[in-house]
Amino acid sequence: MKELAKQYDPSQVEDRVYQFWLDGGYFHTKADPDKKPYTIVMPPPNVTGQLHMGHAVDNTMQDILIRTKRMQGYAALWVPGTDHASIATEAKVVEAMRAEGLTKEMVGRDGFLERAWAWKTKYGNRIVSQLKKLGSSCDWDRERFTMDEGCSEAVKEVFVRLYDKGLIYRGNRMVNWCPHCNTSISDAEVEYEEKDGHFWHLLYPVKETGEMLELATTRPETMLGDTAVAINGEDPRYAHLHGCHVILPLLNKEIPIVCDEHADMTKGTGVVKITPAHDPNDFEVGLRHELPIVRVFTYDGHMTGAADKAAADALFAAGKNTVNEPHVLDCGKYAGMTTLEARKAILVDLEAGGFLKETEPLKHEVGTCYRCHSTIEPMISKQWFVKMEPLAKPAIESVEKGDIKFVPERFTKNYMNWMKNTRDWCISRQLWWGHQIPAWYCDDCGETVVAKSAPCTCPKCGGTKLTQDPDTLDTWFSSALWPFSTLGWPNEESADLKYFYPTNTLVTGYDIIGFWVSRMIFSGLAYTGKAPFDTVCIHGIVRDSQGRKMSKSLGNGIDPLEVIAKYGADALRFMLVDGSTPGNDMRYSEKKVEAARNFANKLWNATRFVLMNLPEDFQPGLPSEDKLDMSDKWVLTKLNQVAGAMSDNLDHYEMGLAAAKINSFIWDVYCDWFIEIAKPRLNSGDAEQADTARRVLVYVLDKALKLLHPFMPFITEELYQALPGSAETIMTQPWPTVDESHNWTAEEEAFEKVMDYIKAVRTMRTEMNVHPAKKTSMIIETADAAPFQSAQVYLAKFAFATDVTFTAKYEGGTDGMVQVSTHAARGFIPMMELIDREKELARLNKEKAKAEKELAMFENQLNNPKFVERAPAALVEEIRNKHAKSQDKLANIEQSIKALG
């Protein structure tokens, strides 16, 4: 048998055990026709990222599921990998280059990509090594990267298929533009923040009447791009202005007044300025009324100037403009200013010209980039889009039919809202790091050629000069294919794809249901004909101890690696799931981590005690039933119950409940009761009883370690290997299941009667400050004496009884006696010589007053007809039970006071 150290030190165990697992190949999974597959794909963390609490909870939950299924006999595959994270990684590389005095343009695309790949090589393994520190039992032989050869092949295959079906198109559309990242982002990537702002009330003169039209805007800098103002055609206030024009202040330019439902008669003055190039609603109004589109912002957040206008004019002159191509304004004195600088300057000029009526403060939601948090600019830009309606419909139906379930179910609504309201997906990004769009443009005739590999000639004109689109695809385009691209798709004959796909469970946070979950679902259905998984298990975010979201600005982030270094990975893992509920946010608590560490120490010490009491020739295995005593059958029944309950919890993704159950079983049932109860048998001199106690101790410990293993894998492996008769690793041992032959419910009930009585006696002695060395006789009044009679050794040891008398009805004197009562027995114990009488009387009188107050409260409730008639029956019954217990409690106290004279 392996000898355990006196104290558990995770730093001496965890790395060694993880390397043992890697060396043994225990994480590797292959297709096995004799086993049922169970597959999870890891949500790929950013390749440049570092482990945070979100990763920790996400991967702990996945590891619990995979380790459980592996023990249950499944071919359990957990596919790991990392995401290339276009915007985040490119920003990191650009920042590093800036320190060298370099820009992307200075080194060129190839030079930049060389640096980006070097960055990925240098930092890409950091997050992987951190996931290993957590104990993640992924099949690292299958580790993938969203830009590896297989994933790149899948991306090109999908792009070409969608293009050929007319589901991918390129055009000038309104997009969300980040002027800092200098790229478009999708609707799902826009985060909204409440900010202080203003409504500026402007006055536009009507050409035909000379009157002033009042309108309000939060963005006066866009007015230079106004090409109309809108009124509602049904608004009687402006019926006389149909067909009229206004003079655009500052530019002195005539623009039309159009009638459109976008102008809401109930809001403000009912007049709105229309800037088709810089507002999505205005863009739609512009299309309806065939208004010019005039861009006044550059893509890096400045006002356009003469050079910008000249470039756009040249495009139009050459006939290379496409549908909805915007014209560009030379903003004159404002050219080159940032948008905020221009806002201030324009407001000064409007006020000077008498066009600014008033300024009204307001709070409003402002769209920001999810990566850099810069304010998003709606811009007309030529981008690639995916038509969403044909793809969204099957994805909605799949969830409606129950092919895919969300846990908790309430998150189905989030998914449905996103899918039913989604617009066409802008998939192009003005970045260099990522999957370059597989589209080429003929320099001679302008033909667009979409193909998986570079074409040699233009299919339209035969020209040989073709230039690839410089843009890359949205990161989520490749990660949407993750469940099947990692298993060999588009090779539909792949053995892994046939066996492991569709996957089973996706574990992820609620914040990326729109970003990622929805896109994987429609992608799986569209390209494989199958839903990519059957269950989406949603977890909340980890907040700080005050319930605040962890953020750099608050400085309240917790580094999981620091927690692991201090307490061990098992303690962190257990804290993250113990008591958690699916879908709900959780709070990080150092006290809970300490409690988990203490739990690990308790288990370590309990195992050491068991091992120290085993002879060298010990052979594990349960003895025959006739050799088991009441306590053995009790603990085996409890073990059976917890095994069944935990299996049910894990089947329903209730990991918090399962963790709480094994914690309670090991701490309360096994350590605090069964080990203590076994000690007298181990030291009794009865060899057969001692052997039985040892065998049951080892058997229960073995099963308990296996039940705990998915939650605390390191310590359970170390302790399991120390047990006599253990196999090579706990990881591949069978998961404990319900053993119908171990359901001794009668013995369980009988033993718990004894336990309850012992607890009551010990509580009474503690309250009376009676030292454990002071023992006394006792009389037990009970209708069922058998359990107590067979447990006299436990009564002597744990209730401090010198001798015990049993009676069905006690009729003796009670002077000097203290009573303890349980639902099954009443004890009469002579305590006078063991206590300080005056002090105990004072305590009892205080307890009596408290008990009388409690009893009166319950009586008032039960004497209230309205409560009894209107409250739920279960609540009324609960109050009646509490009332009865309160009566018994008061009677016991009064009897004890009487006994003390």
Outline where the language-model segments fall.
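Structured ligand/cofactor/substrate-binding pocket environments in proteins
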Residues: 54-66, 73, 82-83, 151-154, ...
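Secondary-structure transition/capping motifs at alpha-helix termini
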Residues: 67-75, 96-109, 129, 133-138, ...
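Short Cys/His-rich metal-coordination motifs, predominantly Zn2+-binding knuckles/fingers
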Residues: 181, 251, 372, 443-445, ...
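Short, polar/flexible loop-turn hinges at active-site or ligand-entry regions and domain interfaces
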Residues: 100-114, 335, 405-406, 561, ...
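Active-site-adjacent bridging/hinge elements
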Residues: 34-42, 64, 100-103, 128-135, ...
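N-terminal, positively charged nucleic-acid-binding surface of large information/translation enzymes
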Residues: 1-234, 275-288, 292-311, 343, ...
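Short acidic-hydrophobic surface loop/beta-edge motif
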Residues: 200-207, 244-249, 367-371, 440, ...
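Feature 926 captures the class I aminoacyl-tRNA synthetase adenylation module centered on the KMSKS loop
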Residues: 201, 417-477, 481, 526-569, ...
